[in-house]
Regions:
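Recognizes extended acidic, P/S/T-rich segments that occur
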Residues: 51-82, 94
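Residue-level detector of high-confidence beta-strand sites
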Residues: 63, 101-103, 221
């Protein structure tokens, strides 16, 4: 353990040492909330402990081995602002017997400033559309053929654990897995830490994104699966990328596979509940449509699974924008829909996959352990049929 981490652990433990207990007979645990979305636990395991389990509000979060009387720092993420959480720290011996339990509660602070978006400030995801952008000559035809006909079933994936994308955060003590591969790009070896609570989406894509907070790496998986009997992870495709990078698996004008069809980093364009709560989304969105163009990759995409050869089909990587002169404030829409619409005017959305419907992507909250979408008033599979779909435009395409 680094001196910095050891110092943090020691400082946190000072306020949590059990008065009247012999040193080492019980675990010592300190807790702090450095921001609105995370809690830091400082754990000094009890004598005889070989493993520690961490639970939040009764839900298992992680489990990991510990060394004799060596402090451990663990950060829990995906928390809600101004909310009380109760942690249970269980110490087990080499036989798996429980030898000590400590419980602590903490209240996260209110959110200060905007929630930080993933990927670099220079990423295409985080760049607003300039004034008077070039519009593609085929824009009207693409909107008329690939968007407007599907408006009746248009939706926002929020509240769906089937099609939204779940996110999990690993710590340096989270279990390290050699992630098996069953279909694409299996010639590379991928080892990554995955916390106990991580679970993929329940729909047919089984997406899962894991960010290692210590190494600053992101694991994107498609058709992810955890085998409980062998405690092993596999995926049909798995890729490691940079959550502070440019937002796709390989560089622009390169072609490569990814956990999503367009070659993007899997959490690119994903709307989070905190962004609705704060009233603004500071990045472009990810969308799908059934009518995608075959054999055409539009920058910044690096791959495609487009289905139709017609020029009126939208190529993956295309960026759409809601007419910025459309008066969103005047609409009788719920607050969350206005937040979405303003983002579509300022940042637009990139076509990232072929879907069964016209949809905008959101975070699945099954890995949070609570329904964050209900807290901001967004229903599951919220309809977007009332968006002015004919007033969207496709910005100038560039083949990659």
């Amino acid at each position: 353990m680094s001196r910095k981490i050891a110092a943090i652990v020691a400082a946190l433990l000072c306020s949590a040492c059990g008065a009247g207990s012999a040193a080492g007979t019980t675990s010592e645990v300190g807790v702090s909330a450095p921001n609105s979305w995370s809690v830091r636990l400082a754990i000094m395991p009890a004598d005889g402990a070989t493993h520690v389990e961490v639970l939040r509000d009764g839900r298992p979060i992680d489990a990991f081995p510990v060394d004799f009387r060596q402090p451990v720092s663990y950060t829990d993420y995906l928390l809600w602002p101004s909310t009380s959480f109760t942690y249970e720290i269980r110490a087990l011996d080499g036989n798996g017997q429980l030898i000590d339990t400590q419980r602590l509660s903490v209240i996260t602070p209110a959110q200060q400033g905007p929630i930080p978006p993933l990927y670099a400030a220079t990423s295409f995801w985080n760049q607003p559309i300039p004034a008077n952008p070039a519009v593609d000559p085929g824009s009207d035809a693409m909107v008329a053929k690939a968007m407007v006909p599907y408006r009746g079933a248009a939706n926002f994936w929020a509240g769906s654990n089937s099609w939204a994308k779940p996110l999990a955060y690993a710590n340096s003590v989270s279990p390290l897995y050699k992630v098996g591969c069953t279909k694409y790009d299996c010639d590379s070896t991928v080892s990554f830490r995955i916390p106990l609570y991580a679970a993929p989406s329940t729909g047919s894509d089984h997406h899962l994104v894991v960010i290692d907070s210590e190494t600053g790496k992101e694991l994107d998986m498609w058709l992810a699966a955890h085998e409980q009997v062998t405690d092993s992870w596999t995926a049909a495709a798995r890729y490691v990328t940079d959550p502070n990078g440019w937002g796709a698996i390989c560089g622009q004008k390169q072609h490569c596979g990814a956990a999503v069809a367009a070659g993007f980093a899997a959490f690119g364009g994903i709307v989070r509940p905190e962004e609705i709560a704060q009233g603004h989304i500071d990045h472009a969105l990810f969308f799908t449509t059934p009518y995608t163009r075959k054999d055409y990759i539009a920058c910044p995409a690096t791959h495609t699974d487009g289905q139709h050869l017609e020029p009126a089909a939208i190529p993956q990587g295309a960026r759409i924008q809601l007419d910025p002169t459309f008066d969103v404030d005047a609409q009788p829409w719920p607050r969350w829909e206005k937040v979405l619409a303003r983002a579509l005017q300022k940042y637009g959305a990139y076509l990232g996959d072929t879907g069964d419907s016209l949809s905008f992507a959101a975070e699945a909250t099954l890995d949070r352990g609570y329904d964050a979408w209900s807290m901001v008033g967004v229903p599951a599979f919220a309809s977007l049929g009332n968006l002015p779909w004919s007033q969207f435009r496709v910005l100038a395409l560039k083949r990659c």
